[in-house]
């Protein structure tokens, strides 16, 4: 008899078929208490869980006594109670490598669109505002040869540094938990403390996961240390930034502009002051959102769940010691 798994995110037909070759698959719309209650017998028997964008906490795990592995279609896993999973010896799988290049593309797009005011001036053209040769009020700022500060030199940080160094001749500063020898050798990146990075960078790109240590890592104190001409980019996790402090910094002119793919609350409230600022490019968490990459992430998540329930946890496992 095949193990039972719960799928709470739609999959392409071929990936669903692959999953069904290994498991009895039960599809649900979400992991809300109502859904769990209505499908209590299914949740009680499930050994695997696959999906994204839902909280997996201790309360849910209490309803799933046979759960052995959960696989998320994402690199981030701050919506999972890792301690609760680990205490119950449940493996947590994620997709850390598939989206690297695509998210780096998004970061570079935010750098370019904020510096060159692409969204703002495009809207002016659409509104009929281009009636004569453009003047300084349409101008942006250069990207090439400007200093890029990267906070978080992981896979995505490395991919961004590659684009910036080779494509735009940008000097690279970075701050991370440890020195990154490859970044220093390939991109001539310079490690520095966060204060130095903030003071010297023309673009500050934040690429950090959300943890207890990184929550509101960026606040009023950090924005005050940045150049008034600097542009802030966040494509990591929204709550790493104190959004009210960011809004205040933009309103006071402490920083020049911001390109944001993530927010403290998602979706972003329609009455957020960020949406009325011409110098803010706000996009709806599209970091990995291409057809190719989202398919690759889903395929990886399917393979991860198959591997995990077969006892193979050599890669993509957040808590591999559970399998020991």
Curated annotation (Swiss-Prot):
CDD domains: GDH
EC number: 1.1.1.79, 1.1.1.81
Record flagged with keyword Cytoplasm: yes
Pfam families: 2-Hacid_dh, 2-Hacid_dh_C
Recorded superkingdom: Bacteria
Localization in the cell: Cytoplasm
Catalytic residues identified in the record: 237, 266, 285
Any one of the GO CC terms: plasma membrane
Alphabetized InterPro entries for the sequence: D-isomer_2-hydroxyacid_DH (IPR050223), D-isomer_2_OHA_DH_cat_dom (IPR006139), D-isomer_DH_CS (IPR029753), D-isomer_DH_NAD-bd (IPR006140), Glyo/OHPyrv_Rdtase_B (IPR023756), NAD(P)-bd_dom_sf (IPR036291)
UniProt catalytic activity: glycolate + NADP(+) = glyoxylate + NADPH + H(+); (R)-glycerate + NAD(+) = 3-hydroxypyruvate + NADH + H(+); (R)-glycerate + NADP(+) = 3-hydroxypyruvate + NADPH + H(+)
An annotated Gene Ontology molecular function: glyoxylate reductase (NADPH) activity
Keyword vocabulary terms for this entry: Cytoplasm, NAD, NADP, Oxidoreductase
Major site of localization recorded for this protein: cytoplasm
Family: Belongs to the D-isomer specific 2-hydroxyacid dehydrogenase family. GhrB subfamily.
Subunit structure: Homodimer.
PANTHER family membership: 2-HYDROXYACID DEHYDROGENASE-RELATED, GLYOXYLATE_HYDROXYPYRUVATE REDUCTASE B
Known function: Catalyzes the NADPH-dependent reduction of glyoxylate and hydroxypyruvate into glycolate and glycerate, respectively.
HAMAP family recorded: 2_Hacid_dh_C_GhrB
Protein name: Glyoxylate/hydroxypyruvate reductase B
The organism's taxonomic lineage, starting at the top: Bacteria, Pseudomonadati, Pseudomonadota, Gammaproteobacteria, Enterobacterales
């Amino acid at each position: 008899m095949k193990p039972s798994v719960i799928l709470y995110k739609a999959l392409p037909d071929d990936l669903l078929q692959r999953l069904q070759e290994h498991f009895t698959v039960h599809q649900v719309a979400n992991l809300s208490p109502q859904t769990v209650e209505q499908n209590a017998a299914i949740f009680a028997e499930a050994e695997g869980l696959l999906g994204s964008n839902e909280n997996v906490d201790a309360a849910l795990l209490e309803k799933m006594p046979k759960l052995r592995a959960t696989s998320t279609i994402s690199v981030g896993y701050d919506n999972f109670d890792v301690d609760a999973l680990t205490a119950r010896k449940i493996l947590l799988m994620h997709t850390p490598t598939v989206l690297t290049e695509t998210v780096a593309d998004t970061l570079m797009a935010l750098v370019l669109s904020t510096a060159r005011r692409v969204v703002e001036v495009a809207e002016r053209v659409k509104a009929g505002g281009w009636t004569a040769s453009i003047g300084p009020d349409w101008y942006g700022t250069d990207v090439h040869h400007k200093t890029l500060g990267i906070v978080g030199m992981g896979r995505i940080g490395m991919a961004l540094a590659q684009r910036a160094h080779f494509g735009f001749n940008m000097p690279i500063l970075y701050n991370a938990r440890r020195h990154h020898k490859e970044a220093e050798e390939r991109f001539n990146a310079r490690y520095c403390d966060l204060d130095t990075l903030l003071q010297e960078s023309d673009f500050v790109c934040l690429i950090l996961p959300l943890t207890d240590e990184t929550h509101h890592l960026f606040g009023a104190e950090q924005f005050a240390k940045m150049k008034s001409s600097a542009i802030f980019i966040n494509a990591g996790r929204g709550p790493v930034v104190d959004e009210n402090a960011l809004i205040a910094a933009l309103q006071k002119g402490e920083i020049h502009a911001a390109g944001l793919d993530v927010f403290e609350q998602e979706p972003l409230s329609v009455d957020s002051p960020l949406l009325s600022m011409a110098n803010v490019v706000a996009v709806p968490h599209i970091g990995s959102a291409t057809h190719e990459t989202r398919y690759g992430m889903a395929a990886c998540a399917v393979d991860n769940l198959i591997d995990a329930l077969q006892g193979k946890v050599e890669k993509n496992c957040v808590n591999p010691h559970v399998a020991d």
